[in-house]
Amino acid sequence: MRRRPLLLTATAALPGSALARPAAEPGRKVLRLAFQSPETTLDPVQTNSDNNTNTVLAQILEAPLGYDYLARPARLLPVTAEALPQVSADGRVFTVRIRAGIFFAEHPAFGGRPRELVAADYVYAIKRFYDPRWNSSDLYLYESLKLPGLSELREQAVKSRRPFDYDREVDGARALDRYTLRITLGVPDPRFTYLMADPVQMGAVAREVVDFHGSDIGAHPVGTGAFRLKSWRRGSQIVLARNPGFRGAVYAGQPAAHPLAQAAAAHLAGKRLPLVDEVVVDVVEESQPRWLSFLEGRYHWLEVPLSFRAQAAPNRRLAPYLARRGITLQSQLRPDIVMHFFFMQHPLVGGYTPDKVGLRRAIGLAFDGPALRSTYFQGYGLAAQSTVPPHTSGYDAAYKSEMGDFDPLRAKALLDLYGYVDRDGDGWREQPDGSALRLVMASGGSQADRLSNEIWKRSMTAVGLRMDFEIATWPELLKKSRAGTLMMWGYSWTAGSPDGGFFLAIAYGPNASESNDPRFELPAFDRLYERQRLLADGPEREALMRRAKDLLVAYMPFKVHLHTERLDLAQPGVLAYWRHPFMRDLWRFIDVPPAAD
């Protein structure tokens, strides 16, 4: 799963001189893209679920499984595995055979010799999430599965203050022989195979490379994937080059009947991957230079910035001036949530007593979500009724709740009911004990963030609540959130798999300070979460997920605003591009024209 900045932009633009189309070596195919926010690190255990970072890593690292690029609904395929895993009858033991003859990209740590991928590399990659040295915020993905022996290894390292013992074998993750990987869960999980398809959470990492670079491993990712890192200017540009040792797989999936899937499959037939020699990713944080650069031909495709949707697709149709240039348009509802959370341990907005719950509900009802959707999101997107997004299990289009309501009158009534009233006549409400009431929302500093803040300020003022803003960068806010020093903050979560259970896991008590940023802890919710995760998808699981969603609406640790809609533009000559709702490692399938002489 991936965190994204709330409104998809951040704080600064590249200098104008950087926006000219760069020269490329004649005949080479160079895919050119732009990110709207900077990456964090290129170490998979330290990404903090950052969307852009994980997207880059997914081109470099490989998991045993992956998604069929052109299949809809999503379907799993073996990647480095010979076949899909064998699963025990109780849903706890997953055994997979890694294909022989797959090699890591060249690196000095290998001493000039080819380094074959083996099952032990996956065991090592999993163990790194448990190593206290790396303090991984994504550890919860494994901890919740209770892999036998791994938490104990971590606890031993913490208590002894000694290095994590990677050499000790445990049942949770074990190499049975050179190519056979066995993962044992402490609790059944019918959807664990989705984690086995995540190139970041289960991408193979070579121990020699980590030992070689030590604490600087975040700048030196090495994997078995189609691309390798060629250069990296932090927060500015990432360049990936074709991995010359890549095995040159071909697309062998089952494409959907959709015309885009059929056209892509026809183009990919028999072609060895990747189709491009290089990928250049610029970080262009402000939307205008990103948009203008696409129009100038610098980038091969672009997720249309929200502020330019009216220019790109008036009335949801591709603008004629773009169509005449051969540019094409794709749209898709994201499996995501745009939300803000309340830190549940904060003395003002946290807590589980009726007055604190009433305050959070009032804030949620007072926020003008329709204004957010109609202004910044240009009317695109779907009002959210729960934390569970479209395209995932547990999502119900007919589910309706207070989460999607904008009702200032009801907000005022709740505030009055619980004693949040204006006692001194200055126009601002005080707390029930008469002390000052001042909300503080954490935020980035971009123009997009300022727009969101204006809506928050106006909404809160309308019901008599003061609101100030704490401005910081995206990485700084991530750190503060993990440290529990924010009162309120907002961002987006994007699904990494079809399992909607993750969007309940962000409120699961044991995940506090990891994915559970509000540190919500409610035993009744935790029991529902634990029960649903053991069940296969079906009516019984759906019913439990609905009850869990009801509790999140009632206690309001999150105010979820909407599920966003993505618009992609592609330049003429871009072939085999069809956005997948979950798959990140798709750059190897994209084809672009070679550079002209």
Stretches with model-predicted labels:
Residues 4-21:
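N-terminal export signals
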